[in-house]
Amino acid sequence: MIDKSAFIHPTAIVEDGAVIGANVHIGPFCIVGPQVEIGEGTVLKSHVVVNGQTKIGRDNEIYQFASIGEVNQDLKYAGEPTRVEIGDRNRIRESVTIHRGTVQGGGLTKVGSDNLLMINAHVAHDCTVGNRCILANNATLAGHVSVDDFAIIGGMTAVHQFCIIGAHVMVGGCSGVAQDVPPYVIAQGNHATPFGVNIEGLKRRGFSREGLVAIRNAYKLLYRSGKTLDEAKLEIAELAEKHPEVKAFTEFFERSTRGPIR
């Protein structure tokens, strides 16, 4: 179904069965598959390919040569009906690739809302990207990676399978992330190691002075106290009872399977 207000360039191909919302703009030489749903106001600039079971929300801007919903690169994939979901108001720049999920990983690759995926960024199968994240040029997420809200991943950075990038994290460019990065942390290097708290980013997002002090104290317990990881977790949990900002650390520890960067 194609809304009558949608614009489809004469050179674009929109296959029967696709659902195209109001005021969608599909530019020259785009290809939209039969199981694709594109929400109101989304723009496909030109030469964009969207296929598979892919649902795109409203008011996204998708630039030339982006590929969304293509078959993933997991060698176990055997053509199962897996999906991609993308939220609203994302900017997906040139040559970005977002692959469909796998049955083993839950069958869904998901990108939230208000994100910026810069040129040539790659989101592999079964990844979850939250809201208001930035993946800089050539940033690469391997399969099953989780990127939490407000995280920034620098250019040319690669993130290992199953890693977690916590909320408000900043990962420097040209890094290799092989373990989980706790929330609020600055990480850099190959393999990435912690370099303090992302204080400037947190200030811009309105964190209170008291909250910033509590986050710094949690960071010091984890990385500067000389305590074991289990000891640090216990003291951070006590700190979280008084300071809600620190709960992000305890929730991170519950999810972490690869262990925090050290």
Curated annotation (Swiss-Prot):
EC id: 2.3.1.129
Q: Which Pfam families match?
A: Acetyltransf_11, Hexapep
Please list the reactions this protein catalyses: a (3R)-hydroxyacyl-[ACP] + UDP-N-acetyl-alpha-D-glucosamine = a UDP-3-O-[(3R)-3-hydroxyacyl]-N-acetyl-alpha-D-glucosamine + holo-[ACP]
According to its UniProt record, in which pathway does this protein act?
A: Glycolipid biosynthesis; lipid IV(A) biosynthesis; lipid IV(A) from (3R)-3-hydroxytetradecanoyl-[acyl-carrier-protein] and UDP-N-acetyl-alpha-D-glucosamine: step 1/6
* GO BP term (any one): lipid A biosynthetic process
One annotated Gene Ontology cellular component of this protein: cytoplasm
Q: Keywords, A to Z? A: Acyltransferase, Cytoplasm, Lipid A biosynthesis, Lipid biosynthesis, Lipid metabolism, Repeat, Transferase
The UniProt family comment states: Belongs to the transferase hexapeptide repeat family. LpxA subfamily.
- Cross-referenced PANTHER family: ACYL-[ACYL-CARRIER-PROTEIN]--UDP-N-ACETYLGLUCOSAMINE O-ACYLTRANSFERASE, ACYL-[ACYL-CARRIER-PROTEIN]--UDP-N-ACETYLGLUCOSAMINE O-ACYLTRANSFERASE, MITOCHONDRIAL-RELATED
HAMAP family recorded: LpxA
Q: How does it assemble?
A: Homotrimer.
- UniProt name for this protein: Acyl-[acyl-carrier-protein]--UDP-N-acetylglucosamine O-acyltransferase
- Organism listed in the record: Salmonella schwarzengrund (strain CVM19633)
Upper lineage: Bacteria, Pseudomonadati, Pseudomonadota, Gammaproteobacteria, Enterobacterales
Q: Which gene encodes it?
A: lpxA
